[in-house]
Amino acid sequence: ISNINNLEEKKNFGSPKEVSPEHLTVYGFHDGSLHHRSLCKTRSGNYPYCNAMLLPSFSLAKSLVATMSLALLEKDYPNIMNENIQDHVPACKQKKWKDVRFKHLLNMATGHYFDKKWYSEDWYLNNKGFSLNYTHKDRIKFSCSVFSKKSPPGIKLSYHSSDTYILGVGLNNFYKSKNGDNADIYKDLILPLWKKLNLTQATYEIRRSIDAIKQPYMEYGMFMTTDDVLKIGAFFMEQNELTEEGVLADALQSNTNQRGLAAIENILYYNNGFWAKKFKGSGLNCAEDVWIPFMSGFGGITVAFMPNQTMYYYFSDNQEYSWDRAVNASNRMSPFCKSN
């Protein structure tokens, strides 16, 4: 690990013009071979054990657990994305769920929402007390009933953490139907991958419902270290059986025919549990526009995967989501596109 202040482009990573320094815990840039990292800050000064500092996933879990579960299951069950939610989540028995499939929940495109003008409605869930439903029974009942149907599934992006909870229940029940009642999708499917990637034990568990069911959350509830973030990122950026085709390939913008649903037209998109930002090619010395996939979490958490195999991340808590300067800096250090 190298101090990020040694980089020539240091002022463009964790830039105070993008993220308030007093709300920034840690940020880092991996240049393909070396990890350049800031100090780890707390409200009471620098944290001396930066390597071991636990960082919250918040919605990174949607990408790391929901998307990864489907990517792993897809190898054995190629049609998994088209499974009907009502076949696996009895609590969503209302007619409005009839045509909703796993893929619609992963893409936040159930057709259920409060108001079409928002692309994210987690603020509405907070107002209604979604996160205060600690038992599976209460949480699934809330999630299945909170929004009404406004359009057919698959068309409109309406981001809801409650939809990821429903998906997690559906996936866990699907997994149990194939592997027995004692099977657990986090313990039996996700955890072996984390162990293979040599992640810290911080990742070995995820938040669960507080009851006998112990339903694993997929919407948030993981912890990790900066090293875990890098190892997961390296896995996403390499060619492997999960990233080359299918759920994860689309999520990582490898499929130019499948960019995802627009959150902000021509700028921000959502695809299979990952976000993507579209950058004008002209600004990056590229012949075509550049799509950068990233994971995002509540408070101001970003993990972005650049086309030159570099990676930028920051964990902050003032709801600031800006990182264009890091993209431009990375491109100057190692151009995204071959110059003509």
Where are these regions (language model features)?
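Solvent-exposed, acidic/flexible segments
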Residues: 54-63, 67, 78, 95-99, ...
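A short, well-structured edge-of-sheet supersecondary motif
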Residues: 4-49, 302-305
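Catalytic-site signature segments of enzymes, centered on catalytic residues
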Residues: 46-54, 126-208, 220
